[in-house]
Amino acid sequence: MVQSLNLGGAQNSQAASGIRRINRLPIVVVIVLAVAFLGIIFYGLASRGLYFGRDKGPESSSGEPASTFADQIKRGVTDGIIGEPQQQTTFQPTPVETKQVDEKASNPFTPTPEQRRGQELEPEAVWRARLEREQQEQYLRERQRQRMARLQANDAAYDAPLAIDRGKLEARTATDDTSAANTSTAISPTAGASDLYAAALRAGLGGQNIDPNGQKSKEDFFNTDLKDLGYLPNRVVPQQSLYELKRGSVIPATLITGINSDLPGRITAQVSQNVYDSATGHRLLIPQGTKLFGRYDSKVSFGQSRVLVVWSDIIFPNGSTLQIVGMAGTDAEGYGGFKDKVNNHYFKTFGSAVMIALIGTGIDMSVPQSSTLATQDTASDAARRNFAETFGRVADRTIQRNMDVQPTLEIRPGYKFNVLVDQDIIFNGIYRN
């Protein structure tokens, strides 16, 4: 029966014997590795559970808070939360405790010793000696300071020149003015010793402390009469006559002749109002219509607008004359000098310059230009160049000469002014024609 089931016969048996069976060794190795891996995982989980299970009791806990684990994880990284500022406690020294001694009860009738004062006064003799020593020390210091100042002043005076020209000293501190050089005078014989000494000091110092604005001379002028402090040297002088015209009074007048500062000259004026005595104001001293005779200054600097006028004589209507020795004239408002018209000669200064420039330009344009090379000098080029140079020099000289022309001040007749009385005038009596 078994043979009948063998349908393929011998050929099928040979074919089956030719097939090779797969090896089972890799499958066994894979299964062993998987079992080992699962065993390791199971062992790890089991051992971890057993380890944590031991610490669940209160007796087995380490006592460390749970926050330490978080700190270990952060490893010192602080929180990103800004808290309130911590108050720093300043160091304060501990006060020394003083033990108070309990006052013992004492008998009020028992005499107690007097308490000593905190600071006893030194004896009067010692105090007076110390005060006298301090005063003597101050006195010696002041004497030494004055002695050193005197020695320095003497050295400066010894180095000063023997001849002192006060005009040069004033010109050094004043502005460059031509009139100052003409009016400079040598030192007056009536000058005081203090003025001479001050001038010698300034000359000895030389140019060390130069005052460009002349402030020192202004202070000297202001304090001329205040050098000697204390009582005034002069006493009150009573009125010498009933017919006096005191200093500070004014004589109103009107100019008759005009003034032109191109040349110096004499002028006349007429008193416009009656002038009475200074004490009562009822005694007529100078009647209306009295003539005044004076002169004016023709030296005018650039920018000046006033004319300096002085009056020398008063001629009364009855023919009598009084010399008033150069009293100054002021305008109606009290300003020094007269001011009316000012001619600065601007047209002459700039007009001549413009005219010469136009003439030079016309001559330069009228000369034909050279057609030759620039390196060659022709007659036309030489003529044009000479004309330009000549007119340039003439223009410079003309402008410079016109710049030196002083302004012309003109005061027209009829100008109202006042004569300022600077000295007391005593008249013979009330004026009678």
From Swiss-Prot:
The chain crosses the membrane at residues 25-45. This is Conjugal transfer protein TrbI. GO terms for cellular component: membrane. Residues 84-124 are annotated as: Disordered. It comes from the Bacteria. The keyword Transmembrane applies. It is a single-pass membrane protein. Keywords: Conjugation, Membrane, Plasmid, Transmembrane, Transmembrane helix. It comes from Rhizobium radiobacter. Residues 85-95 have a biased composition (Low complexity). Pfam families: TrbI. It is found in: Membrane. Belongs to the TrbI/VirB10 family. Its main location: membrane. Residues 114-124 have a biased composition (Basic and acidic residues). The keyword Transmembrane applies. InterPro entries: T4SS_VirB10/TraB/TrbI, T4SS_VirB10/TrbI.
